[in-house]
Amino acid sequence: MIRISDAAQAHFAKLLANQEEGTQIRVFVINPGTPNAECGVSYCPPDAVEATDTALKFDLLTAYVDELSAPYLEDAEIDFVTDQLGSQLTLKAPNAKMRKVADDAPLMERVEYMLQSQINPQLAGHGGRVSLMEITEDGYAILQFGGGCNSCSMVDVTLKEGIEKQLLNEFPELKGVRDLTEHQRGEHSYY
């Protein structure tokens, strides 16, 4: 579920040495499954452990995860990085904003997950986003662009060279993508 590097474990162990005996850490997600999801780590004294918590035992500590946060922390990584500017704890949780779907989930769910977790974060840099409207019986993903992508002069390139290539590579059962958007150029358009 969660990988904690040796450096991060050593950092936590040093901090925990100054806490009440038996105190461990808790890893959690606030607003899981939403665009506002935030991950955190806190101290977890022995009396704060719930029966429904998952206990993840590591060499130097135990990390507790509450029942609600657990699916959103799948594939999460905690590291303690030191460089010329100093040291910092990093927590990467790729599924915090959206729960990972199973490999055997319906095609619509798997495509939607890829759009939300991989493609929309790229488009967000330009203030854009794309939504899956449907998958036709003949295997076309019907998409609708919004935000800065609406009427952007590069939308065709983004659709065919970016999104379509990624989707077809990941989902060979798709035949292609089509744009349902009625593009109206305005100040919101990126290019």
UniProtKB/Swiss-Prot annotation:
Family assignment from sequence similarity: Belongs to the NfuA family.
Protein name from the UniProt record: Fe/S biogenesis protein NfuA
One example GO MF annotation: 4 iron, 4 sulfur cluster binding
InterPro entries: Fe/S_biogenesis_protein_NfuA (IPR017726), FeS_biogenesis (IPR000361), FSCA_dom_sf (IPR034904), HesB-like_dom_sf (IPR035903), NIF_FeS_clus_asmbl_NifU_C (IPR001075)
PANTHER family from the UniProt entry: FE_S BIOGENESIS PROTEIN NFUA (PTHR11178:SF51), IRON-SULFUR CLUSTER SCAFFOLD PROTEIN NFU-RELATED (PTHR11178)
Keywords recorded for this protein, A-Z: 4Fe-4S, Iron, Iron-sulfur, Metal-binding
Needed cofactors: [4Fe-4S] cluster
NCBIfam families linked: PRK11190.1 (NF008392), YhgI_GntY (TIGR03341)
